[in-house]
């Protein structure tokens, strides 16, 4: 599913190029989105601008970012960063379904971008003019994640779509030309989510354009976790997109935010709805290598499902997971937004946890404030986006050394 070419080129802060002229046709129920914070975190419930304790150790490599989210190292050794932008002033009220107060309606604009932190510590803009939104409580979303496949840069768009004030720039995946900063959509995920609805969406927390939050490369495809509908999709480089699993069918509204791959299995982490309850988040194992066939009426395993990803295992004990990564030690690391029990995220309560081989869960980094994403670098250090939901100009990139 390929859209017409769209490009964004930075030149003195101006974006040049055209965007695909298209109008989304809504096929979903009216939005009652009172808790999009479940997928996007929430400034309404946290004073993230307050003074917070710093992380337990580490170095600030860059600052002044706009709610940075996912990040990935490129073949050139540089770190590429998803920047949410600052939203915009465009309103689509009366045009399509809107999020309800106190979260919506949203206002959009082409202010999101992709940043590059090179090996000398210089921060530059790689691509700009990408869709971004701001809601009534100040949450920002634009570029959600970045990944490299066959040395080409792909970016996941989470701030697009008509319901977010960007009717001509949907949520989806774009391919970025690193030579000139131009970008093209390879798939329209806004339209895909509407044409392939989840089995059990939460009507009180529904986003028509979805909330694609994280993306990884697995088996030569781009796997995307959508947090609001609870679906995981896979997209090939030609734009062909398929639904891998509908998590809502077996798990309900758990707000999956992250996915990691190990061999042929996928590992999904979830945020859980707010208010926060400690250790309610899980790591869910998905596998296609399951021999179990359920014959219970109404629950019977269909023949077509035997070769698909199914839930194989689940491990609780985590809180508000926003990213999962495997380390060089083969162990799984989880980035937590905040472990404040019985409430909402607090500055300084973000952590990185490690699931050890004996099953224990160990804190390896603490003192983070609303982290948005993490990745391991070629030096085996952890790179984390800190202040990932704190407003324009507050975001940081941290480098943390953890013993593996």
Per-region residue spans from a language model:
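Short loop/turn segments that connect beta-strands within beta-propeller blades
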Residues: 118-122, 177-181, 236-240, 287-291, ...
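Surface-exposed loop and turn segments in beta-propeller and other repeat-based domains
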Residues: 122-138, 181-207, 245-251, 296-314
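Short, solvent-exposed loop/turn segments at conserved positions within beta-propeller repeat blades
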Residues: 90-110, 163-169, 227-228, 275-281, ...
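Residue position within the beta-strands of beta-propeller blades
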Residues: 80-83, 155-157, 224, 267-269, ...
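Blade-level signature of beta-propeller repeat domains, shared across WD40, Kelch, NHL, RCC1
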Residues: 375-404
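Beta-rich, blade/repeat-based domains predominating
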Residues: 64-76, 111, 132-152, 193-222, ...
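Residue-level signature of beta-propeller blades and closely related beta-rich strand-turn architectures
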Residues: 85, 159-161, 228, 272, ...
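A short loop-to-beta-strand structural motif that recurs across blades of beta-propeller domains
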Residues: 110-115, 171-174, 231-234, 281-285, ...
